[in-house]
Amino acid sequence: MMNIKTNPFKAVSFVESAIKKALDNAGYLIAEIKYDGVRGNICVDNTANSYWLSRVSKTIPALEHLNGFDVRWKRLLNDDRCFYKDGFMLDGELMVKGVDFNTGSGLLRTKWTDTKNQEFHEELFVEPIRKKDKVPFKLHTGHLHIKLYAILPLHIVESGEDCDVMTLLMQEHVKNMLPLLQEYFPEIEWQAAESYEVYDMVELQQLYEQKRAEGHEGLIVKDPMCIYKRGKKSGWWKMKPENEADGIIQGLVWGTKGLANEGKVIGFEVLLESGRLVNATNISRALMDEFTETVKEATLSQWGFFSPYGIGDNDACTINPYDGWACQISYMEETPDGSLRHPSFVMFRGTEDNPQEKM
């Protein structure tokens, strides 16, 4: 297994003054669609071994079967049109065709095949497969849709250093690689991220509103002159209704007694990577029911008694089966004192096999 920290360029929150400065310097901005997918880093070394990794350098469970040698990568590396003979990393957004974000990200994080996902498996099963059968889930690559942001020489990735290629040139590098990827891996839908050039802040706002109306999450605004940096750095900015943060589940949030959601799990206490503890709620009724039933089953199995609020002077009796799970929350804004407005639970970030390890 390749021991590498991909640490891709990650956009920071929208900062109008910084964006205006980049606009004044370059004369325009590059605005790309912000896709609802799973950030993926595909590393290919000079021996034609590939590694399909998440943005935190963990193997993506549903794509683990793609790791290792593939003669098609060898042919691509030997193609005269390939500028990266010593290996490269593709940085992009991984999506599953024909399904929404939550379904797609769930499939990519899935470890075991069952009746809910076997139609997406690379093999055709005649009989229903159950999770207890322990059949590894292998996503058929025909279901994969990949939007590419960048391509980096592998030695730069391994060094941990920034890649000294400006955004405006990186787009051309991606366009040069696309025909090779489409030729050697035609079953995968490869595309460059949809991008636009805007020449003032009014035009940027109009584009943002247009893409939101089309159903997209928002935009990634990029400084054309900024090189590809490693990690969460200024030069790429998220333009979307909310910000997000990662954290670890510490507890359950129960609905208020006497109100409609009494007796239901309405969210989680989450310890953010910043060290702040928040109550992340605002989940669907379907998730409330799912989480509540899971907690109830775990508690009854352990104690034979379930009481989310306690009875009389007795404390509540519940077990949190989600304790320690990695997750992502969203929030409207951060106040000057560091607290978050309207934190909401978005999704689990761990894998099915290890929910406590962020993917």
UniProtKB/Swiss-Prot annotation:
Q: Which GO terms describe its biological process?
A: DNA recombination; DNA repair; DNA replication
Which major enzyme category is it? ligase
- What keywords is this UniProt entry annotated with? ATP-binding, DNA damage, DNA recombination, DNA repair, DNA replication, DNA-binding, Ligase, Metal-binding, Nucleotide-binding
Give the residues the record marks as binding a divalent metal cation.
E217
Provenance organism = Escherichia phage T7
GO molecular function annotations of the record? ATP binding; DNA ligase (ATP) activity; double-stranded DNA binding; metal ion binding
Family from the record: Belongs to the ATP-dependent DNA ligase family.
User: So where's the catalytic machinery, residue-wise?
Assistant: K34
Binding of ATP: at which residues?
A: E32, I33, K34, Y35, R39, R55, V56, S57, E93, K232, K238
Its EC number is: 6.5.1.1
Function noted in UniProt: DNA ligase that seals nicks in double-stranded DNA during DNA replication, DNA recombination and DNA repair in an ATP-dependent reaction. Binds specifically to DNA nicks containing a 3'-OH and a 5'-phosphate group.
Q: What is this protein called?
A: DNA ligase
Q: Which SUPFAM superfamilies match?
A: DNA ligase/mRNA capping enzyme, catalytic domain, Nucleic acid-binding proteins
Q: Which reaction does it catalyse?
A: ATP + (deoxyribonucleotide)n-3'-hydroxyl + 5'-phospho-(deoxyribonucleotide)m = (deoxyribonucleotide)n+m + AMP + diphosphate
For activity, the cofactor(s) needed are: a divalent metal cation
Instruction: Give the InterPro entries listed for this entry.
Output: DNA_ligase_ATP-dep_cent, DNA_ligase_ATP-dep_CS, DNA_ligase_ATP-dep_T7_C, DNA_ligase_T7, NA-bd_OB-fold, NAD_dep_DNA_ligaseB
Keyword Chloroplast listed: no
